[in-house]
Regions:
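Peripheral, non-AAA+ core regions of ATP-driven protein-machinery
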Residues: 2, 18-21, 25-225
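N-terminal Sec-pathway targeting helices
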Residues: 1-11
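Hydrophobic membrane-insertion alpha-helices, especially the h-region
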Residues: 11-19
């Protein structure tokens, strides 16, 4: 079942520098030609109309642009059409602020804006955070994400891809959406049990940011001096 037709009351769960949360009418942006724009796939879990657990693939919209000041990285979250829970915002913020220094990127004048483009739904959880953060890095470096690939996991303070739950459901959701490769944490959630790889699909455990970024882009994480 497509997740778009689930009841709007359903809360979607996925698994400063400051966090700013505003309605879209409040922000003043540069001209569209100065804004980098990317829509990325993320894996999550929810329940269907029979209240059974299910995996799903949804989208996050990222805008990135450079300001004229040097007042520090700003990470902002749209409140429309969908929203991010406080935990999701904190997880994304933490992942971005860990990934950008690992890539040796100057960020003092950047603004990152994120949108969950599903009216009436709220994004919960942390498992989208590594995918969002490494996508921001790729945008900043001008390196496209490879088609048919996605990542689920967090970013730890040691620079590793952290464990998340619901892997089997997420892998199956990606398979049904015709993804060729899914990157998962090499350290598993012990309560999650084993997962199986669908036919003709690659599931690749990754430990470090470097491994995950190379898998998503085919490029090295760290920007050259």
């Amino acid at each position: 079942m497509s997740w778009q037709i689930i009841s709007k009351a359903l809360m979607v769960g996925l698994g400063v520098v400051g966090i700013v949360c505003w309605g879209p009418e409040i922000w003043a942006k540069p001209s569209p030609s100065q804004i980098l724009h990317l829509q990325i796939p993320i894996l999550g879990t929810s329940v269907n109309t029979q209240h059974l657990p299910m995996g799903l693939v949804s989208q996050i919209v990222i805008d990135l642009y450079e300001r004229r000041d040097q007042d520090g990285l700003q990470i902002q979250f749209h409140t429309e059409p969908g929203k991010f829970s406080l935990f999701a915002r904190q997880s994304i913020h933490q992942a971005i602020t860990r990934a950008l220094p690992a890539a040796n990127l100057p960020v003092a004048s950047w603004t990152v804006q994120l949108k969950f483009p599903y009216a009436g739904l709220t994004m919960y959880g942390e498992s989208l955070s590594a995918m969002v953060a490494l996508s921001v890095v790729a945008m900043a470096k001008g390196e496209p994400l490879l088609e048919g690939r996605t990542l689920t996991g967090t970013i730890t303070d040691q620079g590793h891809i952290g464990a998340v739950g619901g892997l089997q459901l997420k892998i199956l959701a990606a398979y049904h959406q015709h993804f060729q490769r899914v990157f998962v944490p090499s350290v598993y959630d012990e309560t999650d049990g084993d997962w199986r790889t669908p036919f003709l699909m690659h599931v690749s455990p990754v430990r470090t940011l470097e491994e995950a970024y190379r898998g998503l882009t085919g490029q090295q994480l760290s920007a050259r001096p």
